[in-house]
């Protein structure tokens, strides 16, 4: 077992909470265990540049809707959008 997989889900989610939401979501491909961990983070940091559109637009709104749908039952501690 590698060291990161020895960490609890709570610790991994805490680490993921410091990443922009899109980068945090990209970790879901690492293994079955990681598939939904990004959705358990209490912070949502959305960056419009990651969505490859100019200015805040419909693509950002769609992404926010998808993220909120996945994490709908969890309290949100921080929510930020950078356009």
Curated annotation (Swiss-Prot):
F-box domain segment(s): 4-37
InterPro entries the UniProt entry points to: F-box-like_dom_sf, F-box_AtFBL13-like, F-box_dom, FBL60-like
One Pfam family linked to the record: F-box
Protein name as it appears in the record: F-box protein At1g19070
Domain of life: Eukaryota
